[in-house]
């Protein structure tokens, strides 16, 4: 006779309760680098390059201006699309993070 071992589960496995607190990270919305200043500097450099240098140097300098201008435009679009910067509740929670409306719950 062959003996078989049967497994009896008396209670389902229970996940331990996590003691971690929920952390909410919000972007400040402030650029780390002032892109407008960089664009202005690049325009001055491009004008100087066109006045003094070859057409290739001039083209490269204006390409740099174009890239920086595009970065400024993309940054503005991202700020407009960022809910944390335009939502009044987010502004309220920044000033009063302990308010009931600002609590964050984990599942």
From Swiss-Prot:
Residues 1-27 form a transit peptide. It is found in: Plastid, Chloroplast. GO terms for biological process: negative regulation of reductive pentose-phosphate cycle; positive regulation of protein-containing complex assembly; reductive pentose-phosphate cycle. GO terms for molecular function: copper ion binding; enzyme binding; nickel cation binding. It holds the Pfam family CP12. The keyword Glycoprotein does not apply. Contains two disulfide bonds; only the oxidized protein, with two disulfide bonds, is active in complex formation. Disulfide bonds join 50-58, 93-102. It comes from the Eukaryota. The keyword Transmembrane helix does not apply. GO terms for cellular component: chloroplast; protein-containing complex; supramolecular complex. Keywords: Calvin cycle, Chloroplast, Copper, Disulfide bond, Nickel, Plastid, Transit peptide. Binds copper and nickel ions. Copper ions catalyze the oxidation of reduced thiol groups and thus promote formation of the disulfide bonds required for linker activity. Monomer. Component of a complex that contains two dimers of PRK, two tetramers of GAPDH and CP12. CP12 associates with GAPDH, causing its conformation to change. This GAPDH/CP12 complex binds PRK to form a half-complex (one unit). This unit probably dimerizes due partially to interactions between the enzymes of each unit. Acts as a linker essential in the assembly of a core complex of PRK/GAPDH. Coordinates the reversible inactivation of chloroplast enzymes GAPDH and PRK during darkness in photosynthetic tissues. Belongs to the CP12 family. This is Calvin cycle protein CP12, chloroplastic. The gene is CP12.
